[in-house]
Amino acid sequence: MAKTIMIQGTMSNAGKSLLAAGLCRVLKQDGYRVAPFKSQNMALNSFITKDGGEMGRAQVVQAEAAGIEPDVRMNPILLKPTTDVGSQVIVNGRVQGNMPAMEYYRRKRDFIPAVMEAYESLAREYDVIVIEGAGSPVEINLQENDIVNMGLARMVDAPVLLVGDIDRGGVFAQLYGTVALQSEEDRRRIKGVVVNKFRGDRAILEPGLKTLEELCGVPVAGVVPYLHVDIDDEDSLSERFGRDKEPRLIDIAVIRLPRISNFTDFSPFERYENVSLRYVERARDLRAPDMIVIPGTKSTIADLQWLRQSGLEASIQKAASGGTLVFGVCGGYQMLGRHISDPEQVEAAGVTEIDGMGLLPLETVFQGEKVQTQTNGVFSGVAGLLSELNGKRYAGYEIHMGRSEEARGALFSMGNVYGSYVHGIFDEQEVADTILKALCTKKSVSFESLGTFDARAYKERQYDLLADAVRAGFDMPLIYRILNQEV
């Protein structure tokens, strides 16, 4: 069976996902077959594996860092919020249905067999399993039925590294308080604490680190700097949405829907030096972009209502009539159509039908069975501004409840309005390049002036930079002693 180590955090966004990815990369570089694991993830950002299973993006990133194919066993339970008090529950990559939060809490321990089967299966195939916890391990009201933090650590006998975020302040209280609130049994599982997102001279920290070690009774296993690596990370959502780049040659506006999902679809455009990618949630902030993107969403009808009430729908329709390129992905694609029906209340929005934006001749009906599949092929039949996509390859995945009449192929177009069910459609560099070339031609600017790069090599380099930072920040001899159960 595999060796294991678990990364828990003092709170959400402490940096667990990124550090777990970095540790996966370090172990891979050191010759280990390593796999990530998170028993339960709550996220709207998801991915479809080759066998059609759905899993959280964080474990996909960690698998990529480890150099292996993403596998639903790495995230056996995925919760996708549908409302403030309920989620769609996905077990081993397949939808089990929608469930109120209280019902899931009561039934949580029923999912332990699925969690353990997934973990033990991975542990038989790999040398090391790097486990990520969720939120804080000392949410006292949730500890009784915990299957993702110390509850899981007990089940698989995992040693724990506890991570605190110094960038928000109060890291010593975070770490000591979290250790102090543990039961004696769980406290013994914590083998080290990590100070994450540090800016400045470590020497200034040293007196505090020594006191922290004395109070917690465990060593400081690492001080990791605030990282500037370009890696898709669920914890970066607020930072990403907060960005408002200075004007660039090409301006792309992504509508920030309240229940936006798979925001990583657009990250390829962020990597061009002279492309501005903005997230917009107010009509007055839309301005006059070169391209408007309506992203995927977990609640198409509710977010379409928000789009209408906010005034953004009218602004997008006006921009489309003026020739602006409008592109909808998945739920955004459905919104662009004429009509959406939900007779079975799949979205539980209290609405059985609603008019769409009317920019594409599309009729969508929500059904109980979810489409979840990887897809690839060659564009054909693309008209208008993006006609140069014809003959070029695409790859991605579909994940949606609705079926749309009139939808044809990977990309449906009418004039300057385009839509697709394919998440990751911009990931192929040739696709992103072709779209940007079309926008440059329309605007009479040089595509070369945007700055180009090798996307795959760039991603691998980012994982290596992350590994460099983790290797330098962690006490790696201590980490290996923890893995070997010598601590």
Task: Please identify what each model-predicted range represents.
Residues 337-391:
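A conserved active-site-flanking secondary-structure segment within enzyme catalytic domains
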Residues 330:
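Catalytic nucleophile serine of serine hydrolases
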